Amino acid sequence: MLYYLFEWLHKLNFPGAGMFGYTSFRALMAVILALLISSIWGDKFINLLKKKQITETQRDAKTDPFGVNKVGVPSMGGVIIIVAILIPCLLLGKLDNIYMILMLITTVWLGSLGFADDYIKIFKKDKEGLHGKFKIIGQVGLGLIVGLTLYLSPDVVIRENIEVHTPGQEMEVIHGTNDLKSTQTTIPFFKSNNLDYADLVGFMGEHAQTAGWFLFVIITIFVVTAVSNGANLNDGMDGMAAGNSAIIGATLGILAYVSSHIEFASYLNIMYIPGSEELVIYICAFIGALIGFLWYNAYPAQVFMGDTGSLTIGGIIAVFAIIIHKELLIPILCGVFLVENLSVILQRFYYKIGKRKGVKQRLFKRTPIHDHFRTSMSLVEPGCTVKFTKPDQLFHESKITVRFWIVTIVLAAITIITLKIR
């Protein structure tokens, strides 16, 4: 909203109004404003949660030995993150930009889904929360909306990067002058760092392009669901999900910025995405909101984000990566979320195999995997064998959290580096 006001003032030659025309200025304003909202207003909101007794309820020490110490800590703090994202974006962003619109829809959509889950847990005293199938329906629905919008909207275009080889000279990367609707996505080790989904269904002949878009929509749904659930599982220790997501967000911000700048896109040999500069405003608000929230969520946590926050930030990361055509970098960048997901899936699969044989068995002492590193064998179900018992030394949750942050930083660096691998 302020963007349009200052654009009007700039036309009237109002001093300083032209600053709002610079993406870098609005991005810095977004991160500062989001940080202030989440840290200053966040404190007041936490006190309100305490007053209304919107807190973690009693946990069963047998099924959740680590949760018993968290009883009484305010939950649903994800509202702080959501508000701190929305306000800067509404004030500083171009609200007619299709990418900004999609990100705002994602924030509200998954925020509402997570809020419903937390509401049922806290106010209805149902520890299971929203039924799993409704969560999946919500995530799939969002993935479908995002995928179809990117397919159908005339504003969603790219300019393809083209490698020009001249004998005796270094390869030069140029971008086409025409805006294209494309099913291409960025992936290292492929020609021009691009993979076209339509090429994967080339056997369909003249229908390959349409089939490529169909495949893209399916992948969009899968990525949104997987990353959203991964972030949800990662939110098991104080500061864990917020810290990891801020690091991932910063990396996505770099990728969005270089994708929106034709010279940087040429240097990295990636596609140029007109209009994606508005995503830099959004992701800066996202980072600022998470850092401000981390002020209260770091160990010992004064507030938990709940599913209101974790489902939302996971979905934001997924949709953002899809919009900038970097979704196939997610397994690297969001490696921590991927491992959290896989640990739970493998644990259940291994348990079911043992159950068929009449044997109690586990792959890990406890999942998601971050809990494995702080769980002693004495907390494992009696008579149950565990495949992987290492490490013998147990770690405090703050040490595990920081180490997971370090792993995410390394994965973020690898993600950026892969773009220069030929």
Swiss-Prot record:
Q: Could you mention a single GO BP entry for this protein?
A: cell wall organization
First-listed, main subcellular location of the protein, grouped into a coarse class: membrane
Q: Which InterPro entries match?
A: Glycosyl_transferase_4, PNAcMuramoyl-5peptid_Trfase, PNAcMuramoyl-5peptid_Trfase_CS
Topology in the lipid bilayer: Multi-pass membrane protein
Cell cycle found in the keyword field:
yes
Q: Could you say which EC number(s) this protein's record lists? A: 2.7.8.13
What is its pathway?
A: Cell wall biogenesis; peptidoglycan biosynthesis
Identify a single GO molecular function assigned to this protein: metal ion binding
GO terms for CC? plasma membrane
Report which reactions are catalysed by this protein: UDP-N-acetyl-alpha-D-muramoyl-L-alanyl-gamma-D-glutamyl-meso-2,6-diaminopimeloyl-D-alanyl-D-alanine + di-trans,octa-cis-undecaprenyl phosphate = di-trans,octa-cis-undecaprenyl diphospho-N-acetyl-alpha-D-muramoyl-L-alanyl-D-glutamyl-meso-2,6-diaminopimeloyl-D-alanyl-D-alanine + UMP
Entry cofactors: Mg(2+)
Q: Which residues form a coiled coil?
A: none
Subcellular location per the Swiss-Prot or TrEMBL entry? Cell inner membrane
Name the UniProt key words of this record, in alphabetical order.
Cell cycle, Cell division, Cell inner membrane, Cell membrane, Cell shape, Cell wall biogenesis/degradation, Magnesium, Membrane, Metal-binding, Peptidoglycan synthesis, Transferase, Transmembrane, Transmembrane helix
Question: Per the UniProt record, which residue ranges are transmembrane?
Answer: 28-48, 71-91, 95-115, 136-156, 211-231, 239-259, 279-299, 313-333, 399-419
Provide the family line: Belongs to the glycosyltransferase 4 family. MraY subfamily.
Which NCBIfam families does the record match to this protein?
mraY
Q: What does this protein do?
A: Catalyzes the initial step of the lipid cycle reactions in the biosynthesis of the cell wall peptidoglycan: transfers peptidoglycan precursor phospho-MurNAc-pentapeptide from UDP-MurNAc-pentapeptide onto the lipid carrier undecaprenyl phosphate, yielding undecaprenyl-pyrophosphoryl-MurNAc-pentapeptide, known as lipid I.
The protein in question is named Phospho-N-acetylmuramoyl-pentapeptide-transferase
Species of the source: Bacteroides thetaiotaomicron (strain ATCC 29148 / DSM 2079 / JCM 5827 / CCUG 10774 / NCTC 10582 / VPI-5482 / E50)
